[in-house]
A protein has these predicted regions:
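Glycine-/charge-enriched secondary-structure boundary and capping motifs
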Residues: 1-121
Length: 121
């Protein structure tokens, strides 16, 4: 484990932006980020917390392209975002799933610094 943050009030992309530094960026597989089905249903109805819009206003400067609003969703008890060496990712994912965290997923990779800190794929 090289870094970790809880995904709470600043949403996934807000907290990911806290992990940026002057040497790395992230490629994020947006479709791999676990989303609670009911959150998707509410977002599709336009029911989105005000904090999510504020998070987008802040963090979008770090993000290439248009991100799903749920990636900015303000959480009160979100998941954990963990960074592990790429060579250990599959093993870490297996251990998390074996421990009962079945929604765990590899959601991206760290890369050399690019124009945007967070590049959505």
């Amino acid at each position: 484990l090289t870094a970790a943050t809880d995904v709470t009030g600043f949403g996934f992309l807000g907290h990911l932006s806290e992990m940026l530094n002057d040497k790395i960026s992230f490629e994020i597989y947006a479709g791999n980020v676990p989303v609670i089905a009911a959150a998707r249903e509410f977002a599709d109805m336009g029911i989105i917390p005000e904090g999510s819009y504020k998070n987008r206003d802040f963090a979008s400067k770090f993000v290439s392209g248009e991100a799903d609003i749920l990636l900015y969703d303000a959480q009160t008890s979100g998941g954990l975002l963990l960074a592990v060496p790429q060579s250990e990712a599959n093993s870490a994912l297996s251990r998390l799933k074996d421990a009962g965290y079945e929604n765990s997923a590899v959601v991206g990779v760290a890369t050399a610094k690019t124009e945007f800190g967070i590049n959505l794929i």
